[in-house]
């Protein structure tokens, strides 16, 4: 009795209330009969104390239960020593698994509520929790699981296997949506490569961008402009339109290379003529018969610039088109201007410089009067009729336009200089036959 009461104050583990009661009942049978009433009284006290200690130990971690069996002695706690150790061995990895995720507080509360009836009923309820733990931890990402595995090295290998398998399969759905985007850059590279190849092969075959559009319209029924083909080669179209246009261009290119002599592929419009290159069709040169040309010459002499009604009448008489007659009169007037240009245009009187010789040779030579020796003081020089107030300079020679007068220019200049030095007087001479 003394030993049981002294050990009661040091018990800190939780056990089944029924097992402890049975153990004490076996001890009470060994004692003498006269002490039975004392044992019953102590049994009630210990039962109440054990129930209080059970609630206190449940509030702490189960790891404190390992202190209890060390204080037990003898065969009295043999029944309590076997089952709590097995329970602790099974609860130790479970407690670490429960504490790993932060959102499983409800699970820990469920564990505490299940441990109150007894330790034997606790073990079968907690056995399925490793499977539930693996199911609850599947949504977590791989890095989170790795950090938890390093933070809790006490986890057994069997509990880490479902987490590692889940971490391997988790990144797969994240990359699935980007698989479509990974194909798009490859398609863009293929389109860029095809556009460059298409341009080179098209130029090699001798087709223009407009030829490709017209040929595709005749062959496949889809007309494309030159701008569309140009934008495709420059990658200026949208991705969707380029994907639609690529198979058609590829088909046309293969047909053009396989059968370049095919008239359906190399149509006449594929090779533009000279008129199409310059943008307008050149008209054929009009040839007019000789008798009609003579008639038109007579009408031109009568009226160089006929009206529209007169041109219509001439065209009807000569059985010609009105536009042809009009153009002929226009060309004839231009020809007349080129022929009679010096006669038709009046000549303004030029202002001569004293040191220059007139270059015009059509006006005829100037008549230069002789310089007499009996008149030493006179100086004869020519001046323009419109420049009467301005005499010529003393050093100027006789102005002439003929080659003979220009050759004698130096001699006349010497004579005029000597006469100027002797007399110093000036005379102006206007030639009556000098016409401008």
Curated annotation (Swiss-Prot):
Subunit relationships: Interacts (via the POU domain) with POU2AF1 and POU2AF2 in a DNA-dependent manner; this interaction recruits POU2AF2 to chromatin and increases POU2F3 transactivation activity.
Record GO biological process: epidermis development; keratinocyte differentiation; negative regulation by host of viral transcription; positive regulation of transcription by RNA polymerase II; regulation of transcription by RNA polymerase II; wound healing
Coiled coil segments of this chain: none
Pfam family, one: Pou
GO CC annotations on file: chromatin; cytosol; nuclear body; nucleolus; nucleoplasm; nucleus; plasma membrane; transcription regulator complex
InterPro entries: HD, Homeobox_CS, Homeodomain-like_sf, Lambda_DNA-bd_dom_sf, POU, POU_dom, POU_domain_TF, TF_octamer
Region Disordered: start-end pairs: 1-40, 140-186, 256-278, 363-421
Keywords linked to the UniProt accession: DNA-binding, Homeobox, Nucleus, Transcription, Transcription regulation
Residue ranges with Low complexity bias: 258-275, 381-397, 405-421
Main location: nucleus
Family to which this protein belongs: Belongs to the POU transcription factor family. Class-2 subfamily.
Annotated DNA-binding residue span(s): 281-340
Protein role: Transcription factor that binds to the octamer motif (5'-ATTTGCAT-3') and regulates cell type-specific differentiation pathways. Involved in the regulation of keratinocytes differentiation. The POU2F3-POU2AF2/POU2AF3 complex drives the expression of tuft-cell-specific genes, a rare chemosensory cells that coordinate immune and neural functions within mucosal epithelial tissues.
POU-specific domain location: 183-257
GO MF terms, alphabetically ordered: DNA-binding transcription activator activity, RNA polymerase II-specific; DNA-binding transcription factor activity, RNA polymerase II-specific; identical protein binding; RNA polymerase II cis-regulatory region sequence-specific DNA binding; sequence-specific DNA binding; sequence-specific double-stranded DNA binding
Tissue: Specifically expressed in epidermis and cultured keratinocytes.
Localization per Swiss-Prot or TrEMBL: Nucleus
Entry keyword annotation includes Nucleus: yes
Name by which UniProt lists this protein: POU domain, class 2, transcription factor 3
